[in-house]
C-alpha cells in the first residue's frame, strides 16, 4: 500500500548539534539570511545531498500571540503544492515544541531591494521582464485564492540568472468570495491606502498596488511614496500623487497611474495589466498559459487521488466541493492546483521548475528525475506528471543502482518511539476504540460496528526503519494466528500511557517480533480473545472497515 508520510502532528524533530552547528531534521543550519516578523531565515544544507535550502524559523509563541495557528495549517498544505517558476517553493514543514521550520527553496542572488540599492534603476526592458515574472506569480496565487499582502522588493529574490522569485507568504491568507480582510499588515511604503487607513479590503487589489510600487522602483530606483515622517508618508499614499520622471515611457506611466489608483474599485486588475500595451511587449508565453476550464462533470482521477492522499480525506469530500462549485474550499483549491501545475508543464515548453539554478528546461529527463531535495523523508512532494506503467511498477527500476521504493500501509515519523505510541493511545481513546497492549510497541485494536454489532480489528506495530526513523504499521489481523504467536494479554482500556517508558528497539528487535513483509488483509471476524465468533462471511466489508479504522486514526493523528 502507499506509504502515508504527512503525519504532521507526529512529524516533530528535535534540534541536534552537528559539528557545533544546529541540525534540524536532515538539514544542518548555517548563517542567517535575514530576520522577519516571526523569526529568522537561515541557510540549510542537506546532510545527504549537500543541496542548500532556506529554512524559515517561525516562533510558536509569536504565532500564538497573533492568533494565526489554526489559519496557517491548511494554507501551508496548499503552499506545498505551489509550483511556479517565480514563487519560492516550500519543500517541507518540520515542527518542534518551540518553533516551526519551513524548508524552502534557496536562491543565491539576494533581494531585489539590495540589487536596486547597489545598481540603481534598471532599464525599461529589464524592468518589464522582471515585472512580468512578478505579476505572473501574483496571478498564480490569486487564481488559487491566496493573497500575499506584503509584496515589496525585499520579498522578491533573484536567482543566479536574474529571475524573480516571490518569497515570504507569512502574512498571506486564503481569500473567499464576500470575505473582507481587516488585518492591517505589510510595509507602509508599499501598503495601499485602504490598508493604512484601516478600511475593509478584499485582498487582490492590495497586491496590485504593491506591485505598482515595485514596478516604479524598478524603473526609477526610488519609491513613489516616501517620507521619514510616517503621518506625511500616509498622507502621500492616500492622496495618490507621485512624481513621474521625464525619461519614463508615457505608456508605462499610464500603467503606473492605473495600478496606483487610490480608489480600489478603479484600480487596475490583473486582466487590465495583462492587456496593457506596455506589459504585452516581449511577454513569454509560459507566464500566462491559457486559463483552465474546470469542469464539474469531468473529474481527473489522478488529481483526485493526490488530494485525498495529501489531505488525508475521502474522495466524497473532494467531489462534494467540486460538484457544489465550492472553489474556495482548500480541497478544491488543491485539486485545481494539481491540474494547473500539470497543464503548465504540458503546454509551456520553456517552462522550467523553480529550482536553483533554473537552467533545466522541461524534457523527458527532467520530468522523471526527482528533485535533489525530494528524499524519502520529506513531507512535501511535488505534483508529478503522468508516468509510464514501468515507472509506476515498484518491481522495476528505470536506473540501475537506485534503491527500489518500499511501500507500506502506515506512517513514518522521526519522533521518539515512546512519544509515538503515547500519541497513538490518545488517538485511539478519542475514537472510542478498544485496545490491548501486547508489548509497548505492539497494540491490538478493535471497533464495534453499531449496525451489525460485529468487531473490526487491526494491529499497530512500530518498526525501526533506520537510526532515526520509525514506521507505524497498520495490519488487519486474525486472532487465532496472533494469539498463538503472542499469547494472551490483559486488555487495557484505560487512557493511561504510563507503560510507555524508555524501551528503544533495534532492527533486530523488530525482526524478533515477526516483522511482516506485506500488509495482511483478512475477511474473518473474530472476538478479541482467542475464540472465533460465528458470523456469516462479509466479502469485502471487513477490508473496507479496516481501512475506515486506519483513516479515522490517521485523521486524529494529523490534527
From Swiss-Prot:
<keyword id="KW-0275">Fatty acid biosynthesis</keyword>
<dbReference type="GO" id="GO:0044877">
    <property type="term" value="F:protein-containing complex binding"/>
</dbReference>
<comment type="subunit">
    <text>AMPK is a heterotrimer of an alpha catalytic subunit (PRKAA1 or PRKAA2), a beta (PRKAB1 or PRKAB2) and a gamma non-catalytic subunits (PRKAG1, PRKAG2 or PRKAG3). Interacts with FNIP1 and FNIP2.</text>
</comment>
<keyword id="KW-0090">Biological rhythms</keyword>
<dbReference type="GO" id="GO:0042542">
    <property type="term" value="P:response to hydrogen peroxide"/>
</dbReference>
<feature type="compositionally biased region" description="Low complexity">
    <location>
        <begin position="516"/>
        <end position="535"/>
    </location>
</feature>
<keyword id="KW-0723">Serine/threonine-protein kinase</keyword>
<dbReference type="GO" id="GO:0043066">
    <property type="term" value="P:negative regulation of apoptotic process"/>
</dbReference>
<feature type="modified residue" description="Phosphothreonine; by LKB1 and CaMKK2">
    <location>
        <position position="183"/>
    </location>
</feature>
<dbReference type="GO" id="GO:1990044">
    <property type="term" value="P:protein localization to lipid droplet"/>
</dbReference>
<dbReference type="GO" id="GO:0030424">
    <property type="term" value="C:axon"/>
</dbReference>
<keyword id="KW-0443">Lipid metabolism</keyword>
<dbReference type="GO" id="GO:0061762">
    <property type="term" value="P:CAMKK-AMPK signaling cascade"/>
</dbReference>
<keyword id="KW-0808">Transferase</keyword>
<feature type="modified residue" description="Phosphoserine">
    <location>
        <position position="356"/>
    </location>
</feature>
<dbReference type="GO" id="GO:0042593">
    <property type="term" value="P:glucose homeostasis"/>
</dbReference>
<dbReference type="GO" id="GO:0070507">
    <property type="term" value="P:regulation of microtubule cytoskeleton organization"/>
</dbReference>
<feature type="domain" description="Protein kinase">
    <location>
        <begin position="27"/>
        <end position="279"/>
    </location>
</feature>
<dbReference type="GO" id="GO:0032007">
    <property type="term" value="P:negative regulation of TOR signaling"/>
</dbReference>
<dbReference type="GO" id="GO:0070301">
    <property type="term" value="P:cellular response to hydrogen peroxide"/>
</dbReference>
<dbReference type="GO" id="GO:0043627">
    <property type="term" value="P:response to estrogen"/>
</dbReference>
<keyword id="KW-0804">Transcription</keyword>
<keyword id="KW-0418">Kinase</keyword>
<dbReference type="GO" id="GO:0008284">
    <property type="term" value="P:positive regulation of cell population proliferation"/>
</dbReference>
<keyword id="KW-0325">Glycoprotein</keyword>
<dbReference type="GO" id="GO:0106310">
    <property type="term" value="F:protein serine kinase activity"/>
</dbReference>
<keyword id="KW-0597">Phosphoprotein</keyword>
<dbReference type="GO" id="GO:0070050">
    <property type="term" value="P:neuron cellular homeostasis"/>
</dbReference>
<keyword id="KW-0832">Ubl conjugation</keyword>
<dbReference type="InterPro" id="IPR039137">
    <property type="entry name" value="AMPKA1_C"/>
</dbReference>
<dbReference type="GO" id="GO:1903109">
    <property type="term" value="P:positive regulation of mitochondrial transcription"/>
</dbReference>
<dbReference type="GO" id="GO:0031669">
    <property type="term" value="P:cellular response to nutrient levels"/>
</dbReference>
<dbReference type="GO" id="GO:0004674">
    <property type="term" value="F:protein serine/threonine kinase activity"/>
</dbReference>
<dbReference type="GO" id="GO:0003682">
    <property type="term" value="F:chromatin binding"/>
</dbReference>
<dbReference type="GO" id="GO:0019395">
    <property type="term" value="P:fatty acid oxidation"/>
</dbReference>
<dbReference type="GO" id="GO:0042149">
    <property type="term" value="P:cellular response to glucose starvation"/>
</dbReference>
<keyword id="KW-0752">Steroid biosynthesis</keyword>
<dbReference type="GO" id="GO:0006914">
    <property type="term" value="P:autophagy"/>
</dbReference>
<dbReference type="InterPro" id="IPR032270">
    <property type="entry name" value="AMPK_C"/>
</dbReference>
<dbReference type="GO" id="GO:0009631">
    <property type="term" value="P:cold acclimation"/>
</dbReference>
<dbReference type="GO" id="GO:0005737">
    <property type="term" value="C:cytoplasm"/>
</dbReference>
<feature type="modified residue" description="Phosphothreonine">
    <location>
        <position position="32"/>
    </location>
</feature>
Amino acid at each position: 500500500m502507499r506509504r502515508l508520510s504527512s503525519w504532521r502532528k507526529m512529524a516533530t524533530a528535535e534540534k541536534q548539534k552537528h559539528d557545533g552547528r544546529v541540525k534540524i531534521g536532515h538539514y544542518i543550519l548555517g548563517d542567517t539570511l535575514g530576520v522577519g516578523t516571526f523569526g529568522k531565515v537561515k541557510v540549510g544544507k542537506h546532510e545527504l545531498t549537500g543541496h542548500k535550502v532556506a529554512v524559515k524559523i517561525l516562533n510558536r509563541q509569536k504565532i500564538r500571540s497573533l492568533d494565526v495557528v489554526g489559519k496557517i495549517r491548511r494554507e501551508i498544505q496548499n503552499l506545498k503544492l505551489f509550483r511556479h517558476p517565480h514563487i519560492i517553493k516550500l519543500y517541507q514543514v518540520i515542527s518542534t515544541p518551540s518553533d516551526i521550520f519551513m524548508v524552502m527553496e534557496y536562491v543565491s542572488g539576494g533581494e531585489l531591494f539590495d540589487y536596486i540599492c547597489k545598481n540603481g534603476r534598471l532599464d525599461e526592458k529589464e524592468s518589464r521582464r522582471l515585472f512580468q515574472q512578478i505579476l505572473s506569480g501574483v496571478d498564480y496565487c490569486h487564481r488559487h485564492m491566496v493573497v500575499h499582502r506584503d509584496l515589496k522588493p525585499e520579498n522578491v529574490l533573484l536567482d543566479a540568472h536574474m529571475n524573480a522569485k516571490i518569497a515570504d507568504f507569512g502574512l498571506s491568507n486564503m481569500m473567499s468570495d464576500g470575505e473582507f480582510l481587516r488585518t492591517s499588515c505589510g510595509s507602509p511604503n508599499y501598503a495601499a491606502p485602504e490598508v493604512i487607513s484601516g478600511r475593509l479590503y478584499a485582498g487582490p487589489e492590495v497586491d496590485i498596488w504593491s506591485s505598482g510600487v515595485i514596478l516604479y522602483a524598478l524603473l526609477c530606483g526610488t519609491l513613489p511614496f516616501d517620507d521619514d515622517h510616517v503621518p506625511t508618508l500616509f498622507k502621500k499614499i492616500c492622496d495618490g500623487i507621485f512624481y513621474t520622471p521625464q525619461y519614463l515611457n508615457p505608456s508605462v506611466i499610464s500603467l503606473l497611474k492605473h495600478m496606483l489608483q487610490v480608489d480600489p474599485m478603479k484600480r487596475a486588475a490583473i486582466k487590465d495589466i495583462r492587456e496593457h500595451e506596455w506589459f504585452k511587449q516581449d511577454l513569454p508565453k509560459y507566464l500566462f498559459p491559457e486559463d483552465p476550464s474546470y469542469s464539474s462533470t469531468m473529474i481527473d482521477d489522478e488529481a483526485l487521488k493526490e488530494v485525498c492522499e495529501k489531505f488525508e480525506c475521502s474522495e466524497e469530500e473532494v467531489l462534494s466541493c467540486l460538484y457544489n462549485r465550492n472553489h474556495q474550499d482548500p480541497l478544491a483549491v488543491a485539486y485545481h492546483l494539481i491540474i494547473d501545475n500539470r497543464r503548465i508543464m504540458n503546454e509551456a515548453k520553456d517552462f522550467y521548475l523553480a529550482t536553483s539554478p533554473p537552467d533545466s528546461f522541461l524534457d523527458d529527463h527532467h520530468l522523471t528525475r526527482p528533485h535533489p531535495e525530494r528524499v524519502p523523508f520529506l513531507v512535501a512532494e511535488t505534483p508529478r506528471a503522468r508516468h509510464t506503467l514501468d515507472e509506476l511498477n515498484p518491481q522495476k527500476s528505470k536506473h540501475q543502482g537506485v534503491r527500489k521504493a518500499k511501500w507500506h500501509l502506515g506512517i513514518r515519523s522521526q519522533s521518539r518511539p515512546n512519544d509515538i505510541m503515547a500519541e497513538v493511545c490518545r488517538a485511539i481513546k478519542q475514537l472510542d476504540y478498544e485496545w490491548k497492549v501486547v508489548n509497548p510497541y505492539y497494540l491490538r485494536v478493535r471497533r464495534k460496528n453499531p449496525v451489525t454489532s460485529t468487531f473490526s480489528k487491526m494491529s499497530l506495530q512500530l518498526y525501526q526503519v533506520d537510526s532515526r526513523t520509525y514506521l507505524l504499521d497498520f495490519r488487519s489481523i486474525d486472532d487465532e494466528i496472533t494469539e498463538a504467536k503472542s499469547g494472551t494479554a490483559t486488555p487495557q482500556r484505560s487512557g493511561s500511557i504510563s507503560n510507555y517508558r524508555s524501551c528503544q528497539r533495534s532492527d533486530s528487535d523488530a525482526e524478533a517480533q515477526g516483522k511482516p513483509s506485506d500488509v495482511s488483509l483478512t475477511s474473518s471476524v473474530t472476538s478479541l480473545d482467542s475464540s472465533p465468533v460465528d458470523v456469516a462471511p462479509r466479502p469485502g466489508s471487513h477490508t473496507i472497515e479496516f481501512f475506515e479504522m486506519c483513516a479515522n486514526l490517521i485523521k486524529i493523528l494529523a490534527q
